[in-house]
């Protein structure tokens, strides 16, 4: 009969140990991915036009001969995680997968800027101070580590601000892909304001698809001050907590998850004012996550819960349907509709 420790079988204990070690060393997942992007490996393989051999790869990378084995080990681990495919014929070679295709710079859909922004020590390094942050009454995690709120930090650090805007723009391109089958969102509209629209990545796609639709990108003055619009696209600087330009619809893409419930109510009330001006009854369209642990696949739930912890560090949150509903009612909206998008996002339309 197998022995037990504290009532646990050795097999249970070793399984638990494996789980612990997986999470203890999970930072290597992120850092090896950052290494591949920093070494431009996805582009090297893409430009090669076919699977690239280890010898060709290290020749292009110009690494010392003593590190060739380390390159192979990193590539093997990245392949195990789904970022490359190992082809074994005469010599071990590497091909892109769908995941690493999303890291090819210059492609229509490239998330390399997201990797660089999130895994910069400015952001990722802050998580070493979770214990200190949890005892602070009002400070965000970044307030603890950076000495100011995240948005204030961006204003004072133009280099990282550029990295952040590039990351958001790269993510917007994938959201735009999800919106391709959502023409109904824009049907019947004459105008829409993209609140927190950054450099206008999403707005430009909307304008191209609906050339008669007037689109306003509304963001902080320092974000939009040097940007040029077009016939149906304009940039307006301002503060969404003070006022939002009037339009038939307001778009909030990845905005509300950054803020507390109290701040979200302030934003939503300003949105309501913007879409009900002059007796009109427009709508507010939200693109964000809706947590549903009962119905979502485990991997989707994990992404949403990861993002929820990430947003908590900004004093924001990801929300389930009941939490969204409570916000909408308190902000004075009458009804809402949730449409799942491809991936882990949902499209929420709310009506005054």
Swiss-Prot record:
Annotated positions binding substrate: 118-127
What the entry lists under SUPFAM superfamilies is as follows: S-adenosyl-L-methionine-dependent methyltransferases (SSF53335), Winged helix' DNA-binding domain (SSF46785)
For this UniProt record, the keywords arranged alphabetically read as follows: Methyltransferase, S-adenosyl-L-methionine, Transferase
Q: Which GO terms describe its molecular function?
A: isoflavone 7-O-methyltransferase activity; protein dimerization activity
Q: Which reaction does it catalyse?
A: a 7-hydroxyisoflavone + S-adenosyl-L-methionine = a 7-methoxyisoflavone + S-adenosyl-L-homocysteine + H(+)
Task: Indicate yes or no for the key word S-adenosyl-L-methionine.
Answer: yes
Pathway the protein takes part in: Phytoalexin biosynthesis; medicarpin biosynthesis
UniProt EC number? 2.1.1.150
Active-site positions, per UniProt? 257
- The EC category is transferase
Q: Does the keyword S-adenosyl-L-methionine apply?
A: yes
Query: In which family does this protein belong, per the annotation?
Result: Belongs to the class I-like SAM-binding methyltransferase superfamily. Cation-independent O-methyltransferase family. COMT subfamily.
What name is this protein filed under?
A: Isoflavone-7-O-methyltransferase 9
Organism lineage reads as: Eukaryota, Viridiplantae, Streptophyta, Embryophyta, Tracheophyta
């Amino acid at each position: 009969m197998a022995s037990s420790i504290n009532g646990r079988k050795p097999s249970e204990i070793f399984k638990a140990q494996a789980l612990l070690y997986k999470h203890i060393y999970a930072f290597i997942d992120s850092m090896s991915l950052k290494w591949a992007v920093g070494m431009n490996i996805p582009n090297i393989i893409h430009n090669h036009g076919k699977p690239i051999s280890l010898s060709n790869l290290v020749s292009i990378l110009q690494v010392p001969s003593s590190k060739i084995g380390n390159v192979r080990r990193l590539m093997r681990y990245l392949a195990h995680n789904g970022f490359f495919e190992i082809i074994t014929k005469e010599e071990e070679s590497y091909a892109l997968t769908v995941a690493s295709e999303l890291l090819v710079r210059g492609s229509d859909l490239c998330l390399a800027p997201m990797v660089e922004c999130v895994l910069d020590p400015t952001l990722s390094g802050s998580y070493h101070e979770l214990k200190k942050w949890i005892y602070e009454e009002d400070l965000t995690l970044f307030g603890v580590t950076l000495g100011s709120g995240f948005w204030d930090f961006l204003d004072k650090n133009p280099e990282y601000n550029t990295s952040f805007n590039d990351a958001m723009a790269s993510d917007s391109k994938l959201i735009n892909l999800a919106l391709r089958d959502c023409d109904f969102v824009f049907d019947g509209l004459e105008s829409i304001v993209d609140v927190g629209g950054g450099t206008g990545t999403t707005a430009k796609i909307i304008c191209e698809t609906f050339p008669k639709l007037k689109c306003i990108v509304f963001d902080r003055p320092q974000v939009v001050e040097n940007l040029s619009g077009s016939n149906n696209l304009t940039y307006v600087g301002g503060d969404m907590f003070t006022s939002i330009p009037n339009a038939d619809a307001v778009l909030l893409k990845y905005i509300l998850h950054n803020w507390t419930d109290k701040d979200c109510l302030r934003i939503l009330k300003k949105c309501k004012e913007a879409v009900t001006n002059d007796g009109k009854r427009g709508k507010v369209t939200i693109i964000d996550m809706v947590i549903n642990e009962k119905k979502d696949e485990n991997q989707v739930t994990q992404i949403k819960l990861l993002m929820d912890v990430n947003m908590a560090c900004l004093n924001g949150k990801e929300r389930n349907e009941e939490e969204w509903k409570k916000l909408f009612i308190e902000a004075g909206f009458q009804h809402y509709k949730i449409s799942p998008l491809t991936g882990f996002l949902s499209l929420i339309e709310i009506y005054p």
